[in-house]
Curated annotation (Swiss-Prot):
Residues recorded as bearing N-acetylserine in the entry: 2
Record's keyword annotation contains Ribonucleoprotein: no
Species per Swiss-Prot/TrEMBL record: Saccharomyces cerevisiae (strain ATCC 204508 / S288c) (Baker's yeast)
Record lineage: Eukaryota, Fungi, Dikarya, Ascomycota, Saccharomycotina
Location within or outside the cell: Mitochondrion matrix
Record PTM: The N-terminus is blocked.
Protein name listed in UniProt: 10 kDa heat shock protein, mitochondrial
Functional description taken from the UniProt entry: Eukaryotic CPN10 homolog which is essential for mitochondrial protein biogenesis, together with CPN60. Binds to CPN60 in the presence of Mg-ATP and suppresses the ATPase activity of the latter.
Subunit structure: Homohexamer.
């Protein structure tokens, strides 16, 4: 059964899950030419859309995710659970530990 969700706001990650949306590469060159969609590569850069509350480890310590909503992060090329949205967008659900890096804002 396949159900398309209308927006990422209807997805609430559990435990240490992080919901991200891939940042789209520029489809326009510096000279103003538009590139065909198939020639625009997918970036490994994403924006955090939602974050789970964390989890309790075996010692009873609360482990919270290291990212927050709005952070720019680097994600692995493969992995995560892709979720299709009704507006032809998609979001990806990762574990916090699978996020490669947080991008510092200048």
């Amino acid at each position: 059964m396949s159900t398309l969700l209308k927006s990422a706001k209807s997805i609430v990650p559990l435990m240490d899950r992080v919901l991200v949306q891939r940042i789209k590469a520029q489809a326009k060159t510096a000279s103003g030419l538009y590139l065909p969609e198939k020639n625009v590569e997918k970036l490994n850069q994403a924006e955090v859309v939602a974050v789970g509350p964390g989890f309790t480890d075996a010692n009873g310590n609360k482990v919270v995710p290291q990212v927050k909503v709005g952070d720019q992060v680097l994600i692995p090329q493969f992995g995560g659970s892709t979720i299709k949205l009704g507006n032809d967008d998609e979001v990806i659900l990762f574990r916090d530990a699978e996020i490669l890096a947080k991008i510092a804002k200048d």
